[in-house]
Each structure stands twice: as structure tokens, then as C-alpha cells.
Swiss-Prot record:
Region of interest (Substrate-binding (SBD)), residue spans: 404-504
Name of the protein in its database record: Endoplasmic reticulum chaperone BiP
Residue span of motif Prevents secretion from ER: 660-663
PTM section of the record: Partially N-glycosylated.
Organism: Schizosaccharomyces pombe (strain 972 / ATCC 24843)
Length: 663
């Protein structure tokens, strides 16, 4: 059946559906089952989790005591690592250590910037039906993961961090995304949450969340602020009005592919070229050497925020040769100046879109670790002619705001007077005759929103129309991003231009789009599309499978942890026995020489067993060895106590069981 495109025939009507509060109110019955809702900043390079309790926001430290966690996942021969542990071993395991996954989520393999990303990653990216998948070695076998699955592993780490702090399970979360993330990237982020065992009840734009962190205590007079959010991999600018707890986004712009990683890569490439030229080699082919260089360049960049120069030293960098170069702040700025200046374009755009002058901006809020770069601050402050605000922590502000949003949704104390009115970042529309982009909802429209428009058929007796949905600012659809498409069938035969087909776009508070179409004659079957599968999104079956696999990984992690704990318990016990029975001032001087030797021999047997089987033994085997050791020791200590030796009855026995986590 031939399909034809649409053309607009009537002036459209608007049914603007804007709730007075973009947040769910605290007394909404639907919030009762949420429990504690956490706020997660799922960053390109670092992630952060926070919670609102008793009117206060707590940034939650991870198991290493750090308030931000590297967005890294790694696979070794026998375990999966997430966070610091994954990042620390990255230089020695580059092909199986995944980072910057946010640059892949919700994207197609054939996108323009994808080839550049793939070239810069030490791990393998493969094409699966135009979806980028990460291929790594897991337990000696090749395994492919979607970006959603890797992101889910990071979200799961954040979930576990929150649960350890709260002492109870967490099932609901607010997760932030760059304001300029498109529909596919937002949906993919929600899917990642589902795989991680989290119901993502709201997606919040990162600069908007940061604005909450900035303006929560500023309720006196209306302010216009610009949030300049330059993170590890993405860049957003939002212009907001803040007035008595109402946060209204007036305009947003940005670049989902610009951030600190790009600055690092420029320096890495510069230093690699310099090293190659001096030594007549090609170090870029050595992934481990490049991993070491990446690690040191990131450190150097941070140092240059407070120093004018830094010495980069790497022992045994390549072919046994050391690396030693000085990097000055001036050189760093020279290498990246075009990227720094590029960040001012979106700033100009939000001023233009909101019809505000520079002089009408009350404050500039810096968010994201890359805003610590002195030249970035200098360019921005020069543009506005005023100093930027440094009153909030750029690494934690987004998670802070997400936690406040979470508090509102769950009805937490102190959150009832907060209202957030966000906007969509890109124009939404459909393709009509001639490949024209007919716009239904313009960019920077407040959400949630709903808009309808009447279209008709292009030829006589047309009974099916193809509705193609796009996002973007260009006149022709070929220059914009296709979100999805569907057919409206069963239109009664009629001359061209007679049927009335109502197309409705609805954007929810998460910025997620639903499109519906209906023949106004009432004879055609209504059709509805939640934009998803046409962009390579995960199907429900995919998500269910990945949830199951994530649970299996969690079970494997649990088994591994228990095995390690059992081994540590055995080693600690044997070590304590050896120390006690080797020392004549302790138990060694209180037992018969034969008994002493029996214990020391048993300890030696355990040490030899650990040497042979320690890497492969199961939890049960470690526990069995402990019991065998007990069988030797217990009768001896019992005999000692029955003879009156030892002043504290079972104190010595308790001592052997005294364990502490080893660093």
C-alpha cells in the first residue's frame, strides 16, 4: 500500500496543557509507595548521589569515603569493578575498562561524532543494527553490552551507596541529564535506571537541578540567572528566573559532545605527537601507555587550575622508556582555546531566545568540574562584565538539586514551596509535503505541554498516511533528527484536502514525547506512538533480559565478596594463631610443646593450601579449612582452660575470631 506524506491545510489550534507545578505535589497519593527517593547525577566522568531528609540535603559518600564516584566499569578475569576500583586499574586493563559511556547512550552508530569517539576509546565498539555496543572480555569470553547496561552498573553503584547510608532499600530515583539531551538519550537513561532496579520517576535537566541548589535559599526578589554547566563530556547553558521558590527555565542551549574529556584528548594527542617526534615511535598503538598518559593528563589539568605549569612524569612509559614533559597553563589554553570560545555561542543563544540583555542577568552560576579552568571563567566573566558566582560546589550541585526534586516528589519536609517549570530543548514537528519540517512545539516551550494541529491527505482517496516525527531547528526534515514514524490507516476515501487528521504532540515533565493521530471523521482507528523503537531504543524484552543479567551480575558480585571475606577470615585466623602460639609470652608459653607444634603445623598446612588453592577456592572450601584448623586448636585451648591457664576463660578464643577489614 502506497504511503503519502501530509500537508497542513488549516490554521492549527493549540491546547496548551501546563500544570501550575511541574513537580508532583507532596500530598499526591501516588507518592506513598515511593519510600525515600534519591537524586542521582549520572555524569560522563563522575557520578554523585544525594538524598533529602528532614528538610536538608545530604551528599552521600561512597565506600571509599568520596562524595563523587568515577563513572567507570571494568571487567577482570574473575570480577566486575565499578567506580574507583575500575578507574584505578584502567591503565593496566584498557580494553576492558569502560568510561565516558554517557557519550554513547541513546545514540546511533552512524552519527557524525561517533567515529571520532570510537577512535579515542581503548575499548571496542561494535555496530549492532546501528546501535553502538561495547565489547569486552568477561571471564575469558567476548561479551557485548549496550550503553544502557553499562550506565545501569553505575546507577546500581549509586543505589548501593545510598542504601548503605540510609540502611534500607531504595527503589525510586530522580536522575539528571544534560538539558540538550534529545528524546532518545532521555529514554535510554530511564531504561538504564530500570535495568539497575530503579524506577526513574523524573528526568531533570542538569542546569535546572543546579539552579535549585543555587537558589533554594534565595527567595526574596526575582532573579535572572545563567547556569553555565561544563562537565566531563557535555555542556549546557540555561537561563532561569527564580522568584519565591519558583524556578522557571526561560531558555536552554548547549552541546552534548563538549567537555573536559575533549580538553584532555587535545592535550593527550599533543603530548603523544611530541613524544613520537622526539623518539621516532608511535606510542598511540600501545593502549596501556596511552592509558597511563590519560591518567596523568587528567591530573595535570586539575593542577593547572591552581598552578602555572606542571611536570608530567611516567616511569616505563613505552618500551621501557620514561616519559617527562612540562605542560604550562598557557600551552593548555592555546591547545583548547577554540573549544573554550565555542562555549560562548550557547550563552549568546539563551540570551537571544529569552529576549534578555547581558545587563539583566543577576548571577552566573558555574557547574561542572571543567568550570574550574581559569581561562573558562575569564572568558565568561569578560563576556558578562561581572564575576561568576562560586557559592555552590560544581561537582555536587546537580545531585543536590536532583535530591530536592526527589524530596518534592516524595513529600519530604521543606520541599512544599518549590516549583520547577522546565522547557524542551529542541523544536518538535512532523514532515509534510516536500520534506518540510512543520513545527508543532517550539524549543524552550515550558513542559509539560500538549499541542494539536489539523492535517489532511495529499492525494485523492488516500486511506493511509505516514506520520514522521522529527526534532531540530532546520527547515527541511533531512537536516533534523528523526524520532519515529507510524501509519494512520483506515481513512475513508475522499478528495485530497477533505479528511481532517488531528496530530497531537504531548511532552511530559520528563521531556519525553508521545505523538497521537486520529481521523476526525471517527471512522479511522486512532494511533499513538511513544517515541522509542525507531531510534534503536531497547524493547521491553531487551530491558527485561538486561534486568535479569544485571541481577545475575549482582549475585556474582555477592558470591565473589563472600568468597573474599571467607578467605580473609581464614587468613586472619591462621595469622592470629601463628602469632599467639609462636610467642612464649602468650599461648606459646602456656601449652605443651607437642600441642604448640600441632597448632603451628596445622597453620602451616593452611598456608600451603592457600598458596595452591587461594585464587580458585569457593567460600565453602575456605570455611572447611577454617573448621579443620578449629578441630586442631579447640581441644588444645579447652585443655588449657580446664587446667586453669588463662584468666579470661574464652577470651583467647574470642581473640582469634576478632576480624577487621583489611585495606
Amino acid at each position: 500500500m502506497k504511503k503519502f506524506q501530509l500537508f497542513s491545510i488549516l490554521s492549527y489550534f493549540v491546547a496548551l496543557f501546563l500544570l501550575p507545578m511541574a513537580f508532583a505535589s507532596g500530598d499526591d497519593n501516588s507518592t506513598e509507595s515511593y519510600g525515600t527517593v534519591i537524586g542521582i547525577d549520572l555524569g560522563t566522568t563522575y557520578s554523585c548521589v544525594a538524598v533529602m531528609k528532614n528538610g536538608r540535603v545530604e551528599i552521600i559518600a561512597n565506600d571509599q569515603g568520596n562524595r563523587i564516584t568515577p563513572s567507570y566499569v571494568a571487567f577482570t578475569e574473575d570480577e566486575r569493578l565499578v567506580g574507583e576500583a575500575a578507574k584505578n586499574q584502567a591503565p593496566s586493563n584498557p580494553e576492558n575498562t569502560i568510561f565516558d559511556i554517557k557519550r554513547l547512550i541513546g545514540r546511533k552508530f552512524d552519527e557524525k561524532t561517533m567515529a571520532k569517539d570510537i577512535k579515542s576509546f581503548p575499548f571496542h565498539i561494535v555496530n549492532d543494527k546501528n546501535r553502538p555496543l561495547v565489547e569486552v572480555n568477561v571471564g575469558g569470553k567476548k561479551k557485548k553490552f549496550t550503553p544502557e547496561e553499562i550506565s545501569a552498573m553505575i546507577l546500581s553503584k549509586m543505589k548501593q551507596t545510598a542504601e548503605a547510608y540510609l540502611g534500607k532499600p531504595v527503589t525510586h530515583a530522580v536522575v539528571t541529564v544534560p538539558a540538550y539531551f534529545n528524546d532518545a538519550q532521555r529514554q535510554a537513561t530511564k531504561d538504564a535506571g530500570t535495568i539497575a532496579g530503579l524506577n526513574v520517576i523524573r528526568i531533570v535537566n542538569e542546569p535546572t537541578a543546579a539552579a535549585i541548589a543555587y537558589g533554594l535559599d534565595k527567595t526574596d526578589t526575582e532573579k535572572h540567572i545563567v547556569v553555565y554547566d561544563l562537565g566531563g563530556g557535555t555542556f549546557d547553558v540555561s537561563l532561569l528566573s527564580i522568584d519565591n521558590g519558583v524556578f522557571e527555565v526561560l531558555a536552554t542551549s548547549g552541546d552534548t559532545h563538549l567537555g573536559g574529556e575533549d580538553f584532555d584528548n587535545r592535550v593527550i594527542n599533543y603530548l603523544a605527537r611530541t613524544y613520537n617526534r622526539k623518539n621516532n615511535v608511535d606510542v598511540t598503538k600501545d593502549l596501556k601507555a596511552m592509558g597511563k598518559l590519560k591518567r596523568e593528563v587528567e591530573k595535570a589539568k586539575r593542577t593547572l587550575s591552581s598552578q602555572k605549569s606542571v611536570r608530567i612524569e611516567i616511569e616505563s612509559f613505552f618500551n621501557g622508556q620514561d616519559f617527562s614533559e612540562t605542560l604550562s597553563r598557557a600551552k593548555f589554553e592555546e591547545i583548547n582555546m577554540d573549544l573554550f570560545k565555542k562555549t560562548l555561542k550557547p550563552v549568546e543563544q539563551v540570551l537571544k531566545d529569552s529576549n534578555l540583555k547581558k545587563s539583566e542577568i543577576d548571577d552566573i552560576v558555574l557547574v561542572g568540574g571543567s568550570t574550574r579552568i581559569p581561562k573558562v571563567q575569564e572568558l565568561l566573566e569578560s563576556f558578562f562584565g561581572k564575576k561568576a558566582s562560586k557559592g555552590i560546589n560544581p561537582d555536587e550541585a546537580v545531585a543536590y538539586g536532583a535530591a530536592v526534586q526527589a524530596g518534592v516528589l516524595s513529600g519530604e519536609e521543606g520541599s512544599d514551596n518549590i516549583v520547577l517549570l522546565d522547557v524542551i530543548p529542541l523544536t518538535l514537528g512532523i514532515e509534510t509535503t516536500g520534506g518540510v519540517m512543520t513545527k508543532l512545539i517550539g524549543r524552550n516551550t515550558p513542559i509539560p505541554t500538549r499541542k494539536s494541529q489539523i492535517f489532511s491527505t495529499a492525494v485523492d482517496n488516500q486511506n493511509t498516511v505516514l506520520i514522521q516525527v522529527y526534532e531540530g531547528e532546520r527547515t527541511l526534515t533531512k537536516d533534523n533528527n528523526l524520532l519515529g514514524k507510524f501509519d494512520l490507516r483506515g481513512i475513508p476515501p475522499a478528495p485530497r484536502g477533505v479528511p481532517q487528521i488531528e496530530v497531537t504532540f504531548e511532552v511530559d515533565a520528563n521531556g519525553v514525547l508521545t505523538v497521537s493521530a486520529v481521523d476526525k471523521s471517527g471512522k479511522g482507528k486512532p494511533e499513538k506512538l511513544v517515541i522509542k523503537n525507531d531510534k534503536g531504543r531497547l524493547s521491553e524484552e531487551d530491558i527485561e533480559r538486561m534486568v535479569k543479567e544485571a541481577e545475575e551480575f549482582a549475585e556474582e558480585d555477592k558470591i565473589l565478596k563472600e568468597r573474599i571475606e571467607a578467605r580473609n577470615t581464614l587468613e586472619n585466623y591462621a595469622y592470629s594463631l601463628k602469632g599467639q602460639f609462636d610467642d612464649d609470652e602468650q599461648l606459646g608459653g602456656k601449652v605443651d610443646p607437642e600441642d604448640k607444634q600441632a597448632v603451628l603445623d596445622a597453620v602451616e598446612d593452611v598456608a600451603e593450601w592457600l598458596e595452591i588453592h587461594g585464587e580458585d577456592a569457593s567460600k565453602e572450601e575456605f570455611e572447611d579449612q577454617r573448621q579443620k584448623l578449629d578441630a586442631v586448636v579447640h581441644p588444645i585451648t579447652q585443655k588449657l582452660y580446664s587446667e586453669g591457664a588463662g584468666d579470661a576463660d574464652e577470651e583467647d578464643d574470642d581473640y582469634f575470631d576478632d576480624e577487621a577489614d583489611e585495606l
